[in-house]
């Protein structure tokens, strides 16, 4: 994987000139000048997903120049490096192989001279056996009752991914009730424990090292709560399992290491739902549906690794994102799923993107002088329309948006889905084409009103349009299509990081706050005034101590 400053390439210089030509061209003009624009700027994946990127401020020349940038920064080489098991996470000396976890073709993937697939398959088989015992009721709690509730205790990648997927696949769920606890705020675990019965609850403690502060604090609180009823510590083994590699700490906690599900250092946290971290997904929707999720992701992996860049969906979306972020100065991207089950999708890729590409140091160790990762945010439609779409339509910020919707709903209730999708289609049209002053005035005339008498209102009803969007229309949200969609975004993130010459798979930015919190924690143990920090931090700590007394 080469270290190439993208701004020093001839393609970047060409894109700068091209931007000067494109900055005042409107999406409306692009459509008016090309009746085949949709056909040229859209593509389908496996007849399950249509990606329409025609409502963007791009031409074929734009894409060609962006593809030149990908070539000059050796994106193809970076893709090969990842899939071949090269240690592309150089700051931690690790391979990056979440693709191995869903390698359904089972072709060998070599890390340090060893094929990782036998171990991957062994853990999958172990999860299958365990989950079937829980789901069938064969596994009994300490009083002989079957498990009814599962509580996943994790944070970051050990929480966001499984929670997002179990919500997205709720139509496929079985009888088990799923709960997720992440925040070290005691309120989170306390509220979940109010809902469950210690006799019928299984806790999954998801921490690779079994030392994560938030996770272990919650796990010990759950254990204490459980033992208040169960009494004997030997019963912990019937109600706790671990997603970890620290067998010693797992055993000391009271968990049978036979119920410890391992994963590897080449699995990054925010790419770990495909690993043992996905056990909560299996317990929610069953092993077969989890395999379908893996299969969908594997299909997208094959598309990404074998399809020419000009037709490669993750690459195309990544390049368009770089175009807006670095040339138009767009700082954010909104992910807007028109499906209530997908309500955690934007939050999941907020972590996926911002923790991956939120870096200001390039792979050479130098501060960059260009934009790297964007701010990611979003909410389900149509809720967002009544919240923040005002700014997207008429604000002063450019916010490129991804609209996502299924053609087939899991809940065909009356005409709800037609109304939902009518909004999905309408919003991208409105954002692209807007509404001119002439149209506003004509609407007044059609209503029998004199525009001249409403001159003071007319400017406020004008929509400039020219707001870029991608539309991702799925046939239906199934385990397979969801797996493919997640992998699409994962590879988009990787592509941008590779081109922008940053390390996508470390996250040193989370460490400093942890270090300082560990230093401050002992200072909160008494009522002494603190003076060892800056005046602001001292003032905050001392006021906290005064108010808690």
From Swiss-Prot:
Pathway as given in its UniProt record = Carbohydrate biosynthesis; gluconeogenesis; Carbohydrate degradation; glycolysis; D-glyceraldehyde 3-phosphate and glycerone phosphate from D-glucose: step 2/4
Q: What does this protein do?
A: Catalyzes the reversible isomerization of glucose-6-phosphate to fructose-6-phosphate.
A biological process from GO: glucose 6-phosphate metabolic process
In the UniProt entry, which residues are flagged as the active site?
A: 355, 386, 514
UniProt-listed Pfam families: PGI
Its main subcellular localisation, reduced to a broad class, is cytoplasm
Localization per Swiss-Prot or TrEMBL: Cytoplasm
Q: Superkingdom of the source? A: Bacteria
* Listed name of the protein: Glucose-6-phosphate isomerase
Enzyme Commission code: 5.3.1.9
Q: Which family does it belong to?
A: Belongs to the GPI family.
């Amino acid at each position: 994987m080469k270290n190439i400053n993208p701004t020093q390439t001839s393609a970047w210089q060409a894109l700068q000139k091209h931007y000067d030509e494109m900055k005042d061209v409107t999406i409306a003009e692009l459509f008016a000048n090309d009746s085949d624009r949709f056909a040229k700027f859209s593509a389908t994946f496996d007849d399950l997903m249509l990606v329409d990127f025609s409502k963007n401020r791009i031409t074929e020349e734009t894409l060609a120049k962006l593809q030149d940038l990908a070539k000059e920064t050796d994106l193809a080489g970076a893709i090969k490096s990842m899939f071949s098991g090269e240690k592309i996470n150089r700051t931690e000396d690790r391979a990056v192989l979440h693709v191995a976890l869903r390698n359904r073709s089972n072709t060998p993937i070599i890390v340090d001279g060893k094929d990782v697939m036998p171990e991957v398959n062994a853990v999958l088989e172990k999860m299958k056996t365990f989950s079937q015992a829980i789901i069938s009721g064969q596994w009994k709690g300490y009083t002989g009752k079957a498990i009814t509730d599962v509580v996943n205790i994790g944070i970051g990648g050990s929480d966001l991914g499984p929670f997002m997927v179990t919500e997205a696949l709720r139509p496929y769920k079985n009888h088990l009730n799923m709960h997720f606890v992440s925040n070290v705020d005691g309120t989170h675990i306390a509220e979940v424990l109010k809902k469950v019965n210690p006799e019928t609850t299984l806790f999954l403690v998801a921490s690779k090292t079994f030392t994560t502060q938030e996770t272990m604090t919650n796990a010990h609180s759950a254990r204490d709560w459980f033992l208040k009823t169960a009494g004997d510590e030997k019963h912990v083994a019937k109600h706790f399992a671990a997603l970890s590699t620290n067998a010693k700490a797992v055993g000391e906690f009271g968990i049978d290491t036979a119920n410890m599900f391992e994963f590897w250092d080449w699995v990054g946290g925010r790419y770990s739902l495909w690993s043992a971290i996905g056990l909560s997904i299996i317990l929610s929707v069953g092993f077969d549906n989890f395999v379908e999720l893996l299969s969908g992701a594997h299909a997208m992996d094959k598309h990404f690794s074998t399809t020419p860049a000009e037709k490669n969906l993750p690459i195309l979306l990544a390049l368009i994102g770089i175009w807006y972020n670095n040339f138009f100065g767009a700082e954010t991207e909104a992910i807007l799923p028109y499906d209530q089950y997908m309500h955690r999708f934007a939050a999941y890729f907020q972590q996926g993107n911002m923790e991956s590409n939120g870096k200001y140091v390039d792979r050479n160790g130098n501060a960059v002088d260009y934009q790297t990762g964007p701010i990611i945010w979003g909410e389900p439609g149509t809720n967002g329309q009544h919240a923040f779409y005002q700014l997207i339509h008429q604000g002063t910020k450019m916010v490129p948006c991804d609209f996502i919707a299924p053609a087939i709903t899991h809940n065909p209730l009356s005409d709800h889905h037609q109304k939902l999708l009518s909004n999905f289609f309408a919003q991208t049209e409105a954002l692209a084409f807007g509404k001119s002053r002439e149209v506003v005035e004509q609407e007044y005339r059609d209503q029998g009103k004199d525009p001249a008498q409403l001159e003071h209102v007319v400017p406020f009803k004008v929509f400039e349009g020219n707001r870029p969007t991608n539309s991702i229309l799925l046939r239906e949200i199934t385990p397979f299509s969801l797996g493919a969609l997640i992998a699409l975004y994962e590879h988009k993130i990787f592509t941008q990081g590779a081109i922008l010459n940053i390390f996508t798979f470390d996250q040193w930015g989370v460490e400093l706050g942890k270090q300082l919190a560990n230093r401050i924690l002992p200072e909160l143990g008494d009522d002494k005034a603190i003076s060892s920090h800056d005046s602001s931090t001292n003032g905050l700590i001392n006021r906290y101590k005064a108010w808690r007394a």
